[in-house]
Design a protein with these regions (language model features):
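C-terminal alpha-helical interaction module
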Residues: 1-324
């Protein structure tokens, strides 16, 4: 998948991402600066200052696209969209008629994302990941942790964002954090723990935790419309990117094959409701998910891409039966 070692790109993996029992361990994000409304962090929330590098296939990047849409920040934060599938040089930005939703990098002219990392730290060692948040004023990457980026987009751009909805309200934060921890470990990252496991035991441990949690979420969504409280919150937007990728990628490629999201009535209808929130459909690209995931050599060495994309998120949902 590729990494930078002392600023040099190498087509290899970080050895520490596999534990002693063969389990997948995700490396921590390395850039962790924070944008603040008042600029006290050194990075003030300003329209036109920040630029996102993303890929439609990546669920972590999808989080930031969701927040850019629901907070109506499209005019304030520019985006470069990578071509699906990790190339020899990693995430790549270019015009390609086969992928009309992908773009060159119009801010810096970087062809590969790793160029942004070495422009920020010439001796950088580690993974090169999306989303990556670039500050035009200082000319460097400031954050590549999706959970932190969406919090900034939610709370620090007041007066710049076109929508002031708070998806992390103070009264619900403790429960949102609890659900986030559960969903991240067993579902968001859980599908990767299944797909990238190197031993049968590691795979089965991740598989069992994944479906136990999906069963729990299915039951929870049978009692209430959203994961926390009576409104859409950060917890919902963090689960959604995994749900829309599950049936077209994780179910088969990552061997998460006990059942599909389509086989969970509550999760299915919940996913459709979130998809139908204004602005969200434009962030969902199922064909790109297929191409992106099935291009991962470690799980699909043949490189053959499935032809079909059998999903329809636009069908009507039944979530209005539950009180909001």
């Amino acid at each position: 998948m590729g990494v930078l070692i002392e600023g040099v790109w190498r087509d290899e993996e970080l050895p520490q991402e596999t534990g002693r029992a063969g389990e997948f361990r995700r490396a921590d994000s390395r850039f962790r600066e924070r944008i603040t409304a008042d600029g006290s962090s050194g990075f003030k929330a300003e329209g036109g200052r920040y630029h996102l590098y993303v890929a439609h296939g990546c669920p972590w990047a999808h989080r930031t696209l969701i927040y850019r849409a629901v907070k109506k920040l499209e005019g304030a934060i520019t985006v470069a969209y990578a071509i699906p599938g990790l190339k020899e040089q990693g995430w790549t930005f270019d015009s390609n008629p086969a992928f009309p939703d992908c773009t060159p990098d119009t801010v810096n002219g970087f062809h590969h994302l790793h160029q942004a990392y070495t422009a920020s730290n010439p001796r950088y060692t580690g993974k090169v990941t999306v989303p990556t948040l670039w500050d035009r004023k200082s000319g460097r990457v400031i954050n590549n942790e999706s959970s932190e980026i969406i919090r900034m987009l939610n709370s620090e751009f007041k007066g710049i964002a076109g929508d002031d909805t708070d998806f992390y309200p103070p009264a619900l934060r403790a429960e949102i954090d609890r659900i986030n921890d559960l969903v991240y470990g067993n579902v968001n990252n859980g599908v990767y723990r299944c797909g990238f496991a190197r031993t049968q035991q590691a795979y089965e441990t991740a598989y069992d935790a994944l479906f136990a949690t999906l069963d729990e979420l299915e039951a929870r969504l049978g009692r209430q419309r959203y994961l926390v409280g009576r409104q859409i919150t950060e917890a919902d937007w963090r689960l959604f990117p995994t749900l829309v990728r599950f049936d077209v990628a994780y179910f088969s490629l990552f061997k998460c094959n006990r059942q599909r999201i389509a086989d969970y009535p509550n999760l299915l209808n919940y996913m459709r409701e979130l998809y139908q929130v204004p602005g969200i459909a434009a962030t969902v690209k199922p064909r790109y998910y297929v191409i992106n995931y099935w291009s991962i050599k470690r799980v699909n060495p043949s490189g053959i891409i499935p032809k079909g994309t059998p999903v329809d998120f636009a069908q009507s949902h039944d979530r209005t039966r539950l009180a909001a």
